[in-house]
Amino acid sequence: MGTKPREERTRPKQKTPTFLLELPLVVEPGQAARLRAHLEAGRQFYNAVLSSGQRRLRQMRADPAWQAARAIPRTHPQERRAAFSALRERYGFSEYAFHDLAKELRVSWLADHLDAVLAQTLATRAYRALNRICVGKARRVRFKSRGRGLSSLENKRNDTGLRFVLDTPAQGHRGWLIWHDDQLPALIDWDDPVVKHGLAHPVKYARLVRRPASSARAQGADREGERYVVQLALAGAPLQKPKHAVGSDTVGLDLGPASIAIVPRQAEARLEPLCAELRPDGRAIRRLQRRMERQRRAANPEHYDEKGRPRKRGKGAPRWKQSQGYQATRRRKAARERRLAAHRKSLHGQLVHQIVAVGHTIITEKLTYIGWQKRYGRSVGLRAPGMLIAHMRRTVASTGGTLREVPTRSTKLSQFCHGCGEVVPKPLSQRWHQCPCGIGPVQRDLYSAFLAAYLDPAADLTPSCAQYVVPWEGAEARLRAAHERVKERAKEGQVLPRSMGIPRARARLPQSRSEATQELLFLSRRGKVEAWKRRPEPPVLVPRESSEPLERSPDEQH
């Protein structure tokens, strides 16, 4: 009795919709010290699991059977999958094998800080990091250093260990995060409709998150300058605010490192710079970085030689000391970067809601943002187009829409011309599409977004001439109007990315508003032509007895 049938035990879990709700926590000084100890234990445990898993991965890849499995052609997927699965099972490289490893490593003092379920979640996190290396999506893993620390811990369920408990209205309607012997009260604003909607849904599990504050004197921060929040994974769909409407059109997007083209089938087209409101103060950040370097050198002179060069570190080398001034400067720099990231996230949310308000079906090309990071590192690091697509994917899924990312190799939207059907590669410097068949000139990004808007995701994704003949008659005027609006913004002085195909507004202005410099005067002296060093002056009219004025030369004036 009590044994479930094999079919029922191996049935996969049903995936239900999940959304997050974040609540700040009120943490006392003693509780904060215990939380730091728990997170430090989690850091060391995660590093131990990661180190053991990395050893298993090296042994598995050194086995000759690994090379034999790689030699199996991809046209035989079942044989290839079976060979790799046998290797993973032999060397214990799977998520459940890592859970068994976590059971072995969770001994001594670690068991006082981490229960079995939390240890399994950390083991799963380590396995996913190593599995990215195994499948070729990453090159190395990062161990959690003492300086970085572990910023979050989560549970698998909400009935034991780290859990969130909500009191009934008769008991005060308060929320508590319970972990070991600590009960951390959560700040709940019941007047907020988002919070009220979220707490009406069942809690799947809770996640404790530690975030740095601007200083120890910041509101809600402990003496180490850190805040604690709880993230609740709730079953259901998030609240849709009335101000965030959902349209019914189909929208085509063309995303670039610094710009985005939005072309719906019915509404007006747009060509916008991505996160144009972001204004990072690079000069202030560089000054903070130089100050941190000076403070680091002053506190650690033994780590530098007589010429100021860092010494090579070996085993047993002394640790780097961090002065209080260095930590304060680091917090100031982190606060600047945190505010910039929050502003970027807010701008992403505004743009996503504007797009979703036009249409619930969005079509764009599937891009490789890692390649953009290599070529346009500064622009991608500032505007984060990959985070924009991830934000859009979550928002569209929560509103019941569809985000379709079409492959670039089959569609070739930036090279295709719907007038003649020719596919002509263009260099990146060519920002206009103009074909001898009569299509164009039209801005390249707008034209690619137009082609994406009229793709049929349910059918063949290869664009054809027939499907664009009728839409082009009404879309050409909308694309030209969108580009004219961009030109007006450039004339007003806004600096726009060069990828929009418009010269920078500063290039149209003269370098100086003063009068043009006059040409040098040349004099003939002793048979040689010499430049006159004095600045030429206008002729002076001297009245004479006669009615005709007499011009005086500059030499005569002096």
Predicted segments — roles?
Residues F19-L25, L184-K196, E272-A276:
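Generic detection of short hydrophobic beta-strand segments and adjacent strand-loop junctions
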